[in-house]
Amino acid sequence: MYTQPTALRSVLDPKYLEYCLSKHYDIGEWNECLYWLRGLNDTYRIRTSKGLYILRVYRQSVEECDVAYELSLLTQLQRELSSVATQVSEPMIQRDGRLYTILDAPEGKRIAAIFRYLSGTENLLHDEKSCFSFGKSAAELHTAMDRITMNQPRFHLDAHFLIDQSLHRIVDYLGETHRSVSFLREFAGALMDRIHTAADQGLDWGICHGDMHGNNNAFQDGDHFTHYDFEWSAQGWRAYDLAQVRGRKRQLEDRKEALWDSFISGYRSVRDFSAQDESAIDLFMIARRFWIMGLDVAFIHNDSGALDFSEDWLEGFVQEFRSYHII
């Protein structure tokens, strides 16, 4: 029984964040801490006497081991990518050598990390030249990831994570007796079977960005693409990573094939991507959509609310899944 006020998700006051964090970093005097973006996590822009920085306050459900993995990966990638055009966001090191701080929040403990502000502009990947360059950058990122060893525990971007866990969340939200559940179970089972069959052919497996749809990657300064937001990075199929680029929505429909061809040509100019891997792209585009449905459900109770996730939302996904004709 709750007898005291509780919060599911708070927005922390910038003044509180400055009080908690400014003493830990050698980034100059804080002149401004501005609430910048509400996403899965909260983002603030910091302006100091030394320049601009980005502060991420992770949602309460993100555990310390998850943040430690992400920031360790970024630190290692900075070294591995030093000789190529591709870059990643830079976590700022605290005076005592730590990369993050655990904060008290109304809903519980939340973790905060500060990153150097990215210069440049977002490339919308609307032309062949940009897509070819972005393909090269994605390949350089995967090549660097192949040279990295991560010792922290981490989930895998496998069929269990993408499909099985998503199905469990969706069914839990809808209820076992909902008329769409039997179809969703059958669809998920068929999708799992197809993924396992494709994987048995020997797909490229390694550390992935995990959210490579372009919005987290296409920040460009000259010839440099900078990749950021590695929250979903883990071991997985590289075809899944590239499927997110293939499924990018912010491109004209009649240009998508030409842009994809340019992207994959750029990727293959740096590292191999087999015919088997490319043949799995469409399958992983479907898997990504099923995972997105599960992600929607995961944030209804404490972020987005149920209003926009009713029967119309469900029917949209069901009709989309039926259109794939995998069952």
List where the protein language model places each region.
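ATP/Mg2+ or Mg2+-diphosphate-binding catalytic cores
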Residues: 5, 292-327
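An alpha-helical support segment within catalytic cores of ATP-dependent transferases
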Residues: 12-24, 146-151, 165-210
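Active-site acidic catalytic loop and adjacent metal/ATP-binding pocket
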Residues: 37-49, 54-55, 91, 192-240
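ATP-binding pocket architecture of kinase catalytic cores
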Residues: 49-150
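A cross-family kinase active-site recognition segment
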Residues: 95, 124-182, 205, 308, ...
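A glycine-centered beta->alpha junction motif in the catalytic cores
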Residues: 97, 108-125, 167-175, 290-307
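Active-site activation/catalytic loop segments of kinase-like enzymes and analogous catalytic loops
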Residues: 239-272, 287-304
